[in-house]
C-alpha cells in the first residue's frame, strides 16, 4: 500500500455501509482519519457497523440525520448505491464538501496501475476476460471493483507494475476526483439507471468520468460502433484505441475474414472462440485491445478465448432436462441485455422468464425480439408492462407468477423438448431480491429441483 498522509487527522463521514462502505471506513481509520459512519440499518441489525466500533470508528445508525452534517467534516465517502438525491448527500454538496466513492480511495493508495472497464452492458464479462488473458500471459493481475471485490481492499495488495483490472459502474464513477486508469475501456451506453442519475445525459457523463483524468500517456479503448461512446471519445486527452464488430479498422481490434485482428494482424479465428453470442464479440474485442495494451501475448489471448465459456449469471448454461436447455441471464438488468440474450438464440424456440424492478422504463424496444418467443412467464413490478408488449408481439401464451422460483416449473410445463428456457429479466432485481446474483441462484436451484 502506498504510504499517504493525505487522510491523517481528517474528519471523514462515510454514508452507507455494506461491503464497500465498511471497507472504506476501515481503510480510512488505518490511514489516521477520524471516521464517522452513517447507515440506514439500525445498529441492532447492523453487523458491519458493530464490527467498526472496536476500531474507534463512531457509528450513527437507523437513519440519515441531516444534523450530523452540522459537524465539521473534510470529506464524505458514500456507498455507490446511495444516489445523489439522498438528503445527506445533497446537504454535503451544498456545504461544498467533496463527495467520493471508495474507488477514489483505492487510487490514492494503490502502487499498481488501473485498467478500468465500464459500460451499460458487458462489463463483468470483459473485465473477467482481460484478467484471465493477463493471468495466462504470466502476469499477476488483480481483479477488483463492481465485480464483487471492493477496490480499496484489493488496492492495498497491489505492487508496482501490477495491473488492477477493475469493473466500474456509473455509480462509482460519479464519485471520483483524481482517479486515473492507465487503460480505460468504455463498451457502450444505453438507457440505464435513470432512477439514479435522473437523465441519460447525467448517466453518460458519469460513464465519461472514466477518461476525465487521463493524460496523453494513457489509453482510451472505445467502441467504434456506438455513436454516443464515440462522441465522448472525441474530447478525451488520452490515446484512442478503437474496437469494432462491424468496421474494418486497420488499427485497433476488429473482425476480418472470420477472425479477430489486432493492428492488422490476425489473433484468433472466431470459430475457435467458445463464448456464445454476437454481443460477446464486442466484449471480446474490447478485452483483446486492453490485454494487448497491457502487454499480453497473442498466445495467452488465444488460450483464454478457446476455453472461456462465460461468467455466472451472464447467459450461463445451467442444465438440460428432458430435452429443454436452461440458461441463467439474471445479469440482464436492462432491456438491451435481454435483446442481446434473445438475439443469441435467434431461430430457436424460447420461453422467456422476465420482470423485476420498475424504473419507469417502457418495454416497446423488446417487441421485435419477442416475436421469436413462443411463451413468456412474468413476475415482479414490471410483469404487466412486459405482458402488454408480449401481447403486441403476438405471443399467445403469457403467464404471471409471484417470483422466479415459481416461474421455473410453469415454464417447464409450457415447454417441449428442444426448447430454450431463458431467465433474462430486462429489469433490476431489487423489488424482490437483494442482488441479481441471488435471483440467478434461485433460478438455478429451481431448475435443479426439476430433475
From Swiss-Prot:
Family annotation (HAMAP family): MurD
The job of this chain, per UniProt, is described as: Cell wall formation. Catalyzes the addition of glutamate to the nucleotide precursor UDP-N-acetylmuramoyl-L-alanine (UMA).
- SUPFAM superfamilies (alphabetical): MurCD N-terminal domain (SSF51984), MurD-like peptide ligases, catalytic domain (SSF53623), MurD-like peptide ligases, peptide-binding domain (SSF53244)
Which pathway does it serve? Cell wall biogenesis; peptidoglycan biosynthesis
Give GO MF terms, alphabetically. ATP binding; UDP-N-acetylmuramoylalanine-D-glutamate ligase activity
Q: Where in the cell is it found?
A: Cytoplasm
Q: Which InterPro entries does the UniProt record give? A: Mur-like_cat_sf (IPR036565), Mur_ligase_C (IPR004101), Mur_ligase_C_dom_sf (IPR036615), Mur_ligase_cen (IPR013221), MurD (IPR005762)
Provide the protein name. UDP-N-acetylmuramoylalanine--D-glutamate ligase
Cystine residue pairs? none
Tell me the keywords, alphabetical order.
ATP-binding, Cell cycle, Cell division, Cell shape, Cell wall biogenesis/degradation, Cytoplasm, Ligase, Nucleotide-binding, Peptidoglycan synthesis
> Can the keyword Zinc be found in this entry's annotation?
no
Recorded catalytic reaction(s): these are:
UDP-N-acetyl-alpha-D-muramoyl-L-alanine + D-glutamate + ATP = UDP-N-acetyl-alpha-D-muramoyl-L-alanyl-D-glutamate + ADP + phosphate + H(+)
Offer one example of a GO biological process linked to this entry: cell wall organization
Domain of life assignment: Bacteria
Against Gene3D superfamilies, the record matches this protein to: Mur ligase, C-terminal domain (3.90.190.20), Mur-like, catalytic domain (3.40.1190.10), NAD(P)-binding Rossmann-like Domain (3.40.50.720)
Gene that codes for this?
murD
Which cellular components does GO assign to this protein? cytoplasm
Protein EC? 6.3.2.9
Identify its protein family: Belongs to the MurCDEF family.
Has UniProt tagged this entry with the keyword ATP-binding?
Answer: yes
Amino acid at each position: 500500500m502506498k504510504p499517504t498522509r493525505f487522510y491523517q487527522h481528517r474528519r471523514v463521514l462515510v454514508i452507507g455501509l455494506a461491503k464497500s462502505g465498511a471497507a472504506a471506513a476501515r481503510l480510512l481509520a488505518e490511514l489516521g482519519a477520524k471516521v464517522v459512519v452513517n447507515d440506514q440499518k439500525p445498529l441492532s441489525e447492523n453487523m458491519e457497523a458493530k464490527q467498526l466500533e472496536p476500531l474507534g470508528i463512531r457509528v450513527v445508525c437507523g437513519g440519515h440525520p441531516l444534523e450530523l452534517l452540522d459537524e465539521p467534516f473534510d470529506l464524505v465517502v458514500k456507498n455507490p448505491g446511495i444516489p445523489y438525491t439522498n438528503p445527506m448527500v445533497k446537504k454535503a454538496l451544498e456545504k461544498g464538501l467533496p463527495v467520493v466513492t471508495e474507488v477514489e480511495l483505492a487510487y490514492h493508495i494503490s502502487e499498481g496501475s488501473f485498467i478500468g472497464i465500464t459500460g451499460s452492458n458487458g462489463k463483468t464479462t470483459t473485465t473477467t476476460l482481460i484478467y484471465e488473458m493477463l493471468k495466462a500471459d504470466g502476469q499477476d493481475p488483480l481483479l477488483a471493483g463492481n465485480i464483487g471485490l471492493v477496490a480499496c481492499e484489493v488496492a492495498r495488495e497491489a505492487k508496482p507494475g501490477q495491473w488492477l483490472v477493475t469493473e466500474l459502474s456509473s455509480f462509482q464513477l460519479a464519485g471520483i476526483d483524481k482517479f486515473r486508469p492507465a487503460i480505460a475501456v468504455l463498451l457502450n451506453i444505453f438507457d440505464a439507471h435513470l432512477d439514479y442519475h435522473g437523465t441519460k445525459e447525467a448517466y453518460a457523463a458519469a460513464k465519461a468520468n472514466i477518461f476525465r483524468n487521463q493524460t496523453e500517456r494513457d489509453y482510451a479503448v472505445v467502441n467504434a460502433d456506438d455513436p454516443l461512446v464515440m462522441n465522448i471519445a472525441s474530447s478525451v486527452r488520452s490515446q484512442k484505441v478503437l474496437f469494432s464488430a462491424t468496421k474494418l479498422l486497420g488499427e485497433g481490434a476488429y473482425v476480418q475474414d472470420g477472425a479477430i485482428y489486432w493492428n492488422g494482424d490476425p489473433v484468433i479465428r472466431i470459430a475457435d472462440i467458445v463464448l456464445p453470442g454476437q454481443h460477446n464479440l464486442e466484449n471480446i474485442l474490447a478485452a483483446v485491445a486492453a490485454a494487448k495494451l497491457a502487454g499480453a501475448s497473442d498466445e495467452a489471448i488465444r488460450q483464454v478465448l478457446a476455453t472461456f465459456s462465460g461468467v455466472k449469471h451472464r447467459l450461463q448454461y445451467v442444465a438440460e432436462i428432458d430435452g429443454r436447455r436452461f440458461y441463467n441471464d439474471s445479469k440482464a438488468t436492462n432491456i438491451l441485455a435481454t435483446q442481446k440474450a434473445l438475439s443469441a438464440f435467434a431461430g430457436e424456440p424460447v420461453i422467456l422468464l422476465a420482470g423485476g424492478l420498475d424504473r419507469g422504463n417502457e418495454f416497446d424496444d423488446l417487441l421485435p425480439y419477442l416475436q421469436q418467443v413462443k411463451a413468456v412467464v412474468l413476475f415482479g413490478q414490471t410483469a404487466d408492462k412486459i405482458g402488454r408488449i408480449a401481447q403486441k408481439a403476438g405471443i399467445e401464451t403469457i403467464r404471471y407468477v409471484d417470483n422466479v422460483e415459481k416461474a421455473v416449473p410453469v415454464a417447464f410445463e409450457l415447454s417441449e423438448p428442444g426448447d430454450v428456457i431463458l431467465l433474462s429479466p430486462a429489469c433490476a432485481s431489487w423489488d424482490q431480491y437483494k442482488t441479481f446474483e441471488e435471483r440467478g441462484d434461485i433460478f438455478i436451484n429451481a431448475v435443479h429441483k426439476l430433475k
